[in-house]
């Protein structure tokens, strides 16, 4: 019997992952052929695979995935440009934190979907609205992470800097360098958030993107193509998350060395 926090070897982790997906796909096959659910609610997996092939050959799946990624990338850059310096200052100066936090803290709990009509009214329905909507969904999360990571900087490190004659700009730079590895680690989740919201943004007056592709399939009741689009989102998001994980391991190898042996089930390997 497994004990609490008992380490699991790499072969066992792989086997458990394969078993989990086999269980999901097997259940999907069974339910779709049992007629317990209508075909539009749960189409046949083989039909979804064929639809995936059609998306690739006939509907420019790769181009649509790239367009969705490009929108997320733009929102990511704008979010970082706002949240990283502001979060650094909030983490460094408590007075600024207590001035801004009462405004931004409630925004993290609000459903972003409720703001979509407001963004359409303010910015129209072009690319600016879509990117702005994604920034709104990402920036408050990143801001909280930056503030938290800056607050974790060891006070002894700051005292050493002061002793060596560092001024405020040098100390802020030191705090940024000390906190950035943790901030970079949050970029994976930030991209996941972007993939979650980009679909909603692309359902409004879009001509490209995975969200547009799914919405177009839904309008003609092609639910096999809808499910194929959903799977495409999952695959694309996983690949980008994996690339960010590789980048983190290359930039900050010491974080992997000192990380705890027990990882959460959803932690990137």
Region spans (language model):
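Short cytoplasmic-facing helical segments at TM-TM junctions of multi-pass membrane proteins
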Residues: 145-186, 210
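Periplasmic/extracellular loop-to-transmembrane helix junction in inner-membrane transport proteins
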Residues: 3-7, 33-77
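Glycine-rich helix-loop "coupling/hinge" segments at transmembrane-helix boundaries
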Residues: 121, 196-233, 252-262
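N-terminal signal-anchor/first transmembrane alpha helix
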Residues: 1-32
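Transmembrane alpha-helices
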Residues: 132-136, 168-200, 227-228, 232-233, ...
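C-terminal transmembrane helix and the adjacent membrane-cytosol boundary/short C-terminal tail
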Residues: 94, 151, 181, 228-269
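Transmembrane-helix boundary motif in ABC transporter permease subunits
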Residues: 74-104
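Generic hydrophobic transmembrane alpha-helix motif, especially the helices
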Residues: 105-141, 148-149
